């Protein structure tokens, strides 16, 4: 169904990524009515109808976004029509400057015109000018273009009148005449230059008919005949010319002020680094900036050895950007690709789907399919790419099809196993295909009553030379077969010898295939004898075995196998193994041949089946959901080494799917190799289409001698085509693409080579690039022009036409339903507000609650709040505090529902008794915690201090319609409980972990590339290695799960409406299933709960357990606690003793070197200043080069600099700006977008100081104040214990937060510890990560020691497995703190100790499993006093 104009506008808004910026009414009602395209001029004009004017800043955002999106395709313009033009006069004033910029006036005159006053009267716009000359000049120069500019913006304007203000005429006359004269001179100069440039370009094109583009051009033109391949550059040369495509670029400014550009280019023979410095008085820098990745350049210069990178580089003298001819699809009718692998085909496909889609669109293909191996993880990106490039997307997958149960016994006979006669046989052949290869040896033994009673062994003459592979495998030579009988004679004799015995073979389907084919060619028809396959029998009755090959089984059963792959020896070994298997079957109750399959079948039978590749194509939306179900089942229920699709599963969910035969690993291709045509045609009827792939892709089958030669391959194609014709299903040519272009194939080779067990390593990888229609037609030219066109073009297009438009991703949010959520959130909010503020609520509380509840309930967000409230309440009830993250603390409703402890109201007092309150709304107080202590004037009770002054808008947006993202920090040890509680709330089938996709990282790719080059004995320069690394980076390597993300499916839908499911990293033992799609793909469609694990709540819980102090009762403004953020005095130590000017070692958020330096620079004394520090330390370009300089120069102090994003909105509102403008400025600054002219003007009008504007312009990212406040609250509570309960603090810190210990140093005296710390500081730049982690622990230990406490050695009698324990004024470390000692060993020591004391080191080793190295460490530590090496035998032990 065609999209409506409104839907087209939504798609456009999504594509250019501004949906979230637009007003909801505009987004929902806007229409994209048409696009005028001029291929000749490369222009697109979008015609858009809107219900109202866009705000000026939104208009500029829209124009910029659409121009950027399509800049590589066309020059874009927009024409807007506004249906409701109310307030046209107000908008005209704001748009005036933009419209002037669309005229051809000089910059100076434009600037002057922008200062003019506007008057709008109906459809006439009056511009007040200073004099008649101005009026005439402007009217002549820009009237028409200015009207056009306004109309393009949607204004209904008939004319523009320039009117004079007589009072100003004379004053401005002289100035204007000078401007006009300057403009005329400049226009003449520009016209002359343009004419000369056109002449030069025309002359150049006549002399050198190339497609060079005059963009980057430095130095002299480079003669094309001088170009040489990069691979030929092997030593220093004076002057060399090359051309290549840029794949990396780095532009740096030097201390001298000059710039150097370093680009890496490749011509796909090799790669090279090119360098060039800017020259004096030249515009080289602008040319350098014109270069970008993907552009082709021609360069000339000197090749020299770069001593820094130790490689050859080119120092360029000349460079020019060129336009390189790209690969084209020249066919009039284009094909459709139905078999294609992206980077989501694990360690196999190379490009992302977007690259394929763009290429297909560039070639003019009407549609393209994606069929990754076993997964559909490219679907979300495929949808976005198809929408962007205007091409039909076909969604599919190449899966692994298995029969539900592989029979052990064929053609069941009513024969008692112990009484039966068996013929155990084996064939040796010229190849693997019973249709195209021949038997060269047939050997058998006859078994009865558990004994071999007869033998049969014959060679047969194949009348062809044996390949080296077969000779090496079977040890049969041509000479041995020269005088051998014909196969007809051998088989006739064999059939008579067998009689009615039961056939037994190892992998019987192979051997019986040759026997039955031979029988049929002799006219006997297929064998009617019963069959038993010992391979499948072993897989069933020996499930504990990981292998079931004949070699392996012979060893397990104690049977001698003297010469494997000679028929008679294999046969005898199989016979003796089978005799023992019959006894096993008897013990399992299997007594008759016809009972084998029934009694030995099990639900894991799918694991025994050999998978065949199958292509599944989604035909409609129902098919998409069914494919999601199939994918999920294959990954969760039927995963065995690889995801498997039982045929019964496919049959159950086949509706809406088209089933294809896939590649040479497919069932039908195998059938052509192993079965006669009637059986092939029978199998073909199961499928909806047959795939045949280019002969080049099957070359490895010929190389591996699985197919005899090209002639045989062509015969296989004919049989496949005939099967399609007979079955009445289309035969289509598919490319099985794994990368875009031929030169990308090296990346796939590298990835495959990195997987030692991958079967693709056994042969040369075929060329699997994305082929054009021309290339595919050429591949199948041997079929004749008509047939080639039919399978390549006609059938692929007709099949594509049968497929409906499918959308794999939802376009809106689906939240769970909880009965009465709206009412409960409202009631809970007011109930807790009344508990805190009294029955007669202050108006400020009512106003804030109503404002928030209107947004929360009105937009359907109450259920999200209620879920979070339930999770937090459960954790609190279980004794664990929860810290909030992000901006949820901006919501007062979240505070009143106990989701967060942060109170966002302005600072205020509350009386806990009579509930009187006092609010400070003028910005004079940064945090309620900073208010001075005060008693209630009414009842005398000490007042509660609250409020962080955070606007609600920073959480749900200015309109309150942004989906709430509630992130919660649970204790790390409680997190699994919180996760599992979601199953209680919603049901196990409604909650899943948020899935992630792990791709090959750059460092990993580097290892792959180096390994491949070393294995191949190839040397490449560094630039080429970098290129190969880039080619391998980003390919899917594994899957995983978000550390805390839980996806909640609403009760009225199921998970398959959104995504398939799987286990993370395919770990079938995982406790949770995850979304198959990366959670970012469905983030806007389903609710994601961020239930994160954090150390702070865990530490608070341990401190509470040790001290009995409720952390919520800890005073937040304790003076001694506040003191440690500027001096260590309250800890009773000096700066010199602990080598630090603050006392914040180990305090969350304030213990790192970077933040400690901030504390030294700012010396905070209040809670609000600590919040500032937290915001400053988490922001980007907020502290360094910004607030730090403002404080140092004395322009402002810590409390007044911009620290958190919310500060901007609050500050600007207090300064007098409208809340909407204050919000816009905050959002623009926090996203690093700076300030618009309108914002700057508004801020200046309200006397915002210049330093504040400058600070805003520097910021790239800002931290939410609510997040900072929550972090600081936790930090202050932990700091309280550090100051007032030191041993509780240190025990908790070392237990929860520390991981790397140097116990040898920690048990020493304080002077020794300090010296070690000081020494490590002196070597800091040379320390590794582990050493730096040890240093962090030693800093805390040094502080602890100087406070008078010490660390004991490990105690065999007292140490716990994981927790530091307090003994007097000391701590005893746990066993886990011993370097190299793991969790299981730590537990085992405690368990062994509980069973009795350790008698010796030998006893310790034996009982606890301690290594000699660990025992020696404990000995050095002094933990094994008087423990002998071996126990002495006592008379009492006798």
Curated annotation (Swiss-Prot):
InterPro entries: DNA_pol3_alpha_NTPase_dom, DNA_pol3_finger, DNA_PolC-like_N_II, DNA_PolC-type_N_I, DnaE2/DnaE/PolC, DNAPol_HHH, DnaQ, Exonuclease_RNaseT/DNA_pol3
One GO term describing the cellular component: cytoplasm
Taxonomic superkingdom: Bacteria
GO biological process: DNA-templated DNA replication
Catalytic reaction list: DNA(n) + a 2'-deoxyribonucleoside 5'-triphosphate = DNA(n+1) + diphosphate
Signal peptide coordinates: none
PANTHER family: DNA POLYMERASE III POLC-TYPE, DNA POLYMERASE III SUBUNIT ALPHA
Protein name, UniProt field: DNA polymerase III PolC-type
Species name: Staphylococcus aureus (strain MRSA252)
């Amino acid at each position: 169904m065609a999209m409506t104009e409104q839907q087209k506008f939504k798609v456009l808004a999504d594509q250019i990524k501004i949906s979230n910026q637009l007003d909801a009414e505009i987004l929902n009602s806007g229409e994209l009515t048409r696009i005028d395209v001029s291929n000749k001029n490369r222009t697109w004009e979008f015609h858009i109808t809107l219900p109202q004017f866009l705000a000026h800043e939104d208009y500029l955002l829209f124009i910029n976004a659409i121009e950027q999106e399509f800049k590589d395709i066309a020059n874009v313009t927009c024409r807007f029509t506004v249906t409701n033009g109310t307030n046209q006069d107000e908008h005209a004033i704001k748009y005036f400057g933009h419209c002037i910029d669309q005229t051809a006036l000089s910059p100076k005159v434009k600037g002057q015109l922008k200062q003019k006053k506007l008057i709008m009267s109906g459809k006439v716009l009056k511009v007040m000018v200073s004099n008649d000359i101005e009026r005439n000049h402007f009217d002549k120069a820009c009237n028409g273009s200015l009207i056009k500019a306004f109309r393009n913006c949607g204004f209904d304007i008939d004319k523009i009148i320039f009117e004079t203000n007589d009072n100003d005429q004379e004053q401005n006359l002289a100035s204007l005449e000078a401007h006009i004269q300057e403009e005329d001179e400049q226009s003449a100069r520009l016209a002359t230059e343009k004419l000369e440039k056109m002449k030069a370009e025309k002359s150049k094109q006549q002399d050198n008919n190339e497609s060079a583009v005059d963009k980057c051009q430095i130095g002299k033109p480079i003669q094309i005949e001088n170009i040489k391949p990069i691979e030929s550059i092997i030593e220093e040369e004076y002057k060399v010319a090359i051309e290549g495509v840029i794949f990396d670029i780095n532009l740096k400014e030097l201390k001298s002020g000059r710039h150097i550009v370093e680009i890496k280019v490749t011509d796909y023979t090799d790669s090279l680094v090119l360098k060039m410095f800017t020259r004096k008085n030249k515009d080289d820098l602008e040319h350098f900036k014109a270069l970008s990745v993907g552009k082709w350049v021609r360069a000339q210069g000197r090749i020299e050895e770069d001593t820094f990178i130790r490689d050859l580089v080119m120092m360029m003298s000349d460079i020019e950007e060129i336009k390189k001819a790209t690969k084209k699809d020249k066919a009039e009718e284009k094909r459709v690709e139905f078999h294609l692998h992206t980077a989501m085909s694990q360690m196999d496909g190379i490009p992302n789907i977007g690259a394929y889609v763009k290429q297909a669109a560039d070639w003019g293909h009407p549609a393209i399919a994606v069929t990754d191996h076993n997964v559909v993880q490219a679907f979300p990106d495929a949808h976005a790419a198809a929408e962007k490039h205007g091409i039909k997307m076909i969604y599919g997958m190449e899966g692994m099809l298995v029969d539900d149960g592989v029979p052990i016994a064929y053609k069941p006979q009513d024969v008692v196993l112990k009484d039966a006669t068996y013929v155990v046989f084996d064939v040796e052949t010229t190849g693997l295909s019973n249709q195209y290869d021949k038997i060269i040896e047939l050997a058998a033994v006859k078994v009865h009553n558990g004994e071999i009673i007869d033998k049969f062994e014959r060679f047969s003459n194949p009348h062809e030379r044996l390949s080296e592979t077969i000779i090496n495998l079977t040890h049969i030579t041509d000479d041995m077969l020269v005088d051998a009988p014909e196969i007809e004679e051998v088989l006739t004799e064999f059939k008579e010898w067998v009689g009615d015995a039961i056939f037994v073979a190892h992998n019987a389907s192979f051997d019986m295939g040759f026997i039955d084919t031979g029988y049929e060619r002799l006219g006997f028809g297929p064998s009617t004898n019963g069959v038993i396959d010992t391979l499948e029998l072993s897989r069933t009755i020996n499930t504990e075995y990981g292998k079931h090959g004949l070699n392996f089984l012979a060893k397990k059963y104690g049977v001698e196998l003297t010469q494997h792959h000679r028929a008679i020896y294999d046969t005898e070994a199989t016979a003796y193994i089978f005799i023992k298997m019959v006894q096993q079957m008897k013990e399992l109750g299997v007594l008759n041949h016809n009972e084998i399959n029934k009694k030995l079948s099990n639900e894991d039978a799918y694991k025994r089946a050999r998978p065949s590749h199958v292509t599944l194509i989604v035909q409609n939306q129902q098919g998409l959901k069914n494919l999601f179900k199939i994918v999920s089942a294959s990954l969760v229920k039927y995963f065995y080494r690889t995801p498997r699709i039982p045929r019964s599963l496919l049959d159950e969910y086949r509706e809406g799917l088209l089933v294809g035969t896939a590649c040479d690993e497919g069932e039908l291709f195998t059938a052509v190799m192993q079965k006669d045509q009637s059986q092939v045609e029978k199998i073909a009827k199961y499928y909806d289409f047959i795939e045949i792939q280019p002969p080049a892709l099957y070359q490895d089958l010929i190389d591996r001698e699985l197919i005899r030669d090209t002639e045989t391959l062509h015969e296989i194609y004919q049989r496949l085509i005939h099967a399609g014709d007979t079955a009445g299903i289309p035969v289509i040519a598919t490319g099985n693409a794994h990368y875009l272009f031929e030169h990308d194939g090296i990346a796939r080779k590298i990835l495959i080579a990195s997987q030692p067990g991958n079967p693709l390593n056994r042969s040369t990888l075929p060329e699997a690039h994305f082929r054009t229609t021309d290339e595919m037609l050429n591949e199948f030219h041997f079929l004749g022009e008509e047939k080639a066109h039919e399978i390549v073009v006609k059938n692929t297009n007709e099949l594509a036409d049968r497929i409906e438009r499918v959308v794999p991703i939802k376009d809106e949010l689906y939240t769970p339903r909880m009965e009465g959520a709206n009412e409960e959130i409202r009631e809970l909010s007011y109930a807790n507000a009344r508990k805190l503020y009294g029955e007669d609520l202050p108006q400020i509380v009512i106003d804030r609650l109503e404002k928030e509840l209107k947004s929360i309930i009105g937009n359907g967000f109450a259920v999200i709040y209620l879920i979070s409230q339930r999770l937090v309440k459960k954790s609190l009830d279980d004794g664990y505090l929860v810290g909030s993250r992000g901006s949820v603390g901006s919501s007062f409703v979240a505070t009143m529902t106990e989701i967060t402890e942060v109170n966002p109201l302005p600072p205020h007092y509350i009386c806990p008794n009579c509930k009187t309150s006092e609010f400070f709304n003028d910005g004079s107080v940064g945090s309620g915690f900073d208010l001075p202590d005060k008693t209630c004037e009414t009842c005398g009770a000490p007042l509660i201090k609250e409020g962080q002054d955070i606007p609600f808008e920073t959480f749900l947006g200015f309109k309150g319609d942004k989906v709430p993202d509630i992130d919660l920090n649970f204790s790390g040890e409680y997190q699994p409980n919180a996760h599992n509680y979601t199953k209680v709330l919603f049901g196990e089938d409604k909650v899943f972990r948020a899935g992630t996709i792990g791709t090959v990282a750059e460092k990993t790719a580097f290892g792959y590339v180096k390994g491949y080059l070393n294995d191949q004995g190839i040397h490449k320069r560094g630039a080429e290695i970098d290129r190969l690394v880039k080619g391998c980076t980003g390919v899917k390597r594994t899957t995983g799960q978000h550390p805390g993300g839980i996806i909640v499916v609403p009760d009225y839908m199921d998970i398959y409406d959104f995504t398939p499911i799987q286990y993370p990293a395919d770990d079938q033992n995982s406790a949770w299933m995850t979304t198959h799609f990366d959670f970012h793909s469905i983030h806007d469609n389903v609710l994601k709960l961020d239930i994160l694990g954090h150390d702070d709540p865990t530490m608070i819980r341990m401190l509470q357990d040790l001290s009995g102090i409720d952390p919520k009762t800890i005073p937040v403004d304790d003076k001694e606690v506040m003191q440690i953020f500027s001096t260590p005095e309250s800890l009773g130590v000096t700066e010199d003793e602990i080598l630090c000017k603050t006392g914040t070692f180990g305090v969350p958020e304030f213990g790192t070197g970077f933040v400690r330096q901030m504390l030294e620079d700012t010396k905070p004394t209040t809670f609000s200043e600590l919040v500032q520090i937290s915001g400053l330390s988490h922001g980007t370009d907020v502290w360094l080069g910004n607030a730090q300089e403002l404080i140092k120069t004395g322009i402002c102090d810590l409390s007044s600099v911009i620290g958190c994003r919310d500060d901007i909105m609050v500050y600007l509102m207090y300064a007098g700006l409208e809340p909407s403008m204050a919000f816009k400025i905050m959002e623009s600054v926090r996203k690093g977008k700076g300030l618009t002219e309108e914002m700057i003007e508004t801020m200046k009008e309200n006397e915002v100081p210049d330093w504040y504007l400058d600070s805003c312009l520097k910021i790239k990212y800002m931290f939410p104040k609510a997040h900072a406040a929550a972090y600081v609250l936790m930090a202050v509570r932990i700091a309280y214990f550090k100051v007032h309960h030191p041993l509780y603090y240190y025990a908790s810190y070392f237990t929860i937060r520390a991981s790397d210990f140097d116990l040898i140093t920690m048990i020493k005296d304080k002077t020794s510890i300090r010296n070690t710390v000081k020494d490590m500081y002196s070597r800091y730049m040379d320390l590794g990560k582990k050493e730096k982690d040890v240093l962090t622990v030693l800093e805390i230990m040094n502080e602890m020691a100087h406070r008078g406490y010490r660390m004991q050695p490990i105690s065999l009698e007292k140490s716990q497995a994981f927790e530091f324990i307090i003994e007097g004024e000391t701590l005893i470390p746990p066993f886990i703190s011993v370097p190299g000692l793991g969790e299981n060993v730590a537990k085992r020591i405690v368990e062994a100790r509980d069973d009795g004391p350790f008698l010796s080191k030998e006893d310790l080793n034996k009982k606890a499993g301690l290594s000699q190295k660990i025992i020696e460490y404990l000995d050095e530590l002094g933990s094994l006093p008087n423990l002998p090496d071996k126990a002495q035998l006592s008379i009492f032990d006798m």
